[in-house]
């Protein structure tokens, strides 16, 4: 049985989030939580939150045992980009892209 949780509109780029997602994909839930807890990256906090939500969904909604769960899928998709303007010298302006992403974490029993 596969159970999912989604985190939409996370304020970090999909490229940076994928670096962390690759570290936990396929691991046991307990190992994945340890990796995310001690990772210094901002994406680790966001992915950990989604993983904890998926674990809670599996335990509460499906009645699965937490010790038997593993991270089956971690998908990071690009979300909408917020476009901002930064004033520069001599009346010029630069564009600033504030990127967002959608994170989907699926856990399954072994």
UniProtKB/Swiss-Prot annotation:
A Pfam family it matches: Ribosomal_L22
Disulphide bridges, residue numbers: none
UniProt-listed GO biological process terms: translation
CDD domains according to UniProt: Ribosomal_L22
InterPro entries in UniProt: Ribosomal_uL22, Ribosomal_uL22_bac/chlpt-type, Ribosomal_uL22_bac/org-type, Ribosomal_uL22_CS, Ribosomal_uL22_sf
Gene3D superfamilies hit by this protein: Ribosomal protein L22/L17
Family of the protein in this entry: Belongs to the universal ribosomal protein uL22 family.
Stated role: This protein binds specifically to 23S rRNA; its binding is stimulated by other ribosomal proteins, e.g. L4, L17, and L20. It is important during the early stages of 50S assembly. It makes multiple contacts with different domains of the 23S rRNA in the assembled 50S subunit and ribosome.
This protein's name: Large ribosomal subunit protein uL22
